[in-house]
A protein has these predicted regions:
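Extended substrate/RNA-proximal surfaces in nucleic-acid metabolism proteins
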Residues: 1, 55-211
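C-terminal regulatory/interaction regions
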Residues: 1, 7, 180, 226-227
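An N-terminally biased module of ancient metal coordination in phosphate/nucleic-acid-related enzymes
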Residues: 1-88
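His/Asp/Glu-enriched short active-site or ligand-binding loop at hydrolase and phosphoryl-transfer sites
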Residues: 212-217
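Extended non-globular interaction regions in eukaryotic gene-expression and organellar proteins
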Residues: 222-223
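Eukaryote-biased recognition of electropositive, low-complexity segments
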Residues: 231
Length: 231
């Protein structure tokens, strides 16, 4: 086997929430370029949009990140169902970047998702996330911060995600669903209430990938242990 270093979940400067980078794009890129072992694949992550992916791709196209062989978009969501820690379940959509029009197709698909607030529907795109943020903040907020507020409030339903996949052949063929398995913001946070058992199974069945750094969780999903070993 030949091991390659991937980072499938990397936020970048300008990410809509919890942006700890500021505008230091050069520092961000240099950290990746100088990493050892070399990082060959990056999943550029943002909440509800692919703006950070587009920015990193533009840097790559301009000659930065020469050792990175593949960059793909990772769109992060919080689901409407919450764990016992009161955190929305963390779900990611990992898109294939092979098609030349993948950006347009992804943004079209994301705009099919909506969140209802005070009897109004807000679509999953930058303009309507800003409108949601302003509505939640009573309007007294600039567009940039409003987008962050809107992204923080927007939650997605499992039924809406299923509908998006069902109605969009390109998404079905070019997107993997990943879900966190942690107690904090993952499906393990639903195991303490038996009434959520079926929903937990539905979410995990919908996913293609389970994100976890826990050795017991890894062994369970690799079929090396039983659910009793997770307790």
């Amino acid at each position: 086997s030949h091991w390659r270093r991937w980072n499938p979940h990397l936020h970048a400067p300008g990410t809509l929430t919890n942006d700890g980078f500021g505008d230091d794009w050069d520092g961000f890129l240099k950290a990746i370029e100088s990493a050892s072992p070399v990082v060959e694949v990056l999943g550029i992550t943002d909440y509800l949009t692919i703006e950070c992916y587009k920015a990193v791709k533009a840097q790559k196209d301009a000659g930065r990140l020469p050792k990175v062989k593949l960059i793909f978009p990772n769109v992060e969501f919080r689901m409407t169902v919450a764990t016992d820690k009161l955190k929305g379940i963390n779900l990611h959509l990992l898109f294939c970047p092979d098609d030349a029009d993948h950006v347009d197709r992804i943004e079209r698909a994301l705009s099919s998702l909506a969140f209802e607030y005070k009897s109004s529907q807000y679509r999953c795109n930058l303009a309507e996330l800003a409108l949601l943020g302003k509505a939640h903040h009573n309007g007294a907020i600039e567009a940039g911060p409003a987008r962050s507020v809107g992204a923080n409030q927007f939650k997605v339903e499992l039924t809406d995600l299923r509908k998006m996949f069902r109605n969009d052949k390109w998404v079905t063929e070019n997107c993997l669903v990943a879900v966190a398995a942690s107690n904090n913001d993952g499906t393990a946070g639903l195991q303490y209430d038996a009434s959520f058992a079926a929903l937990r199974q539905e979410i995990e069945t919908f996913a293609h990938v389970i994100f976890s750094s826990n050795a017991k969780t890894r062994d369970f999903w690799l079929g090396k242990s039983s659910s009793d070993d997770l307790k």
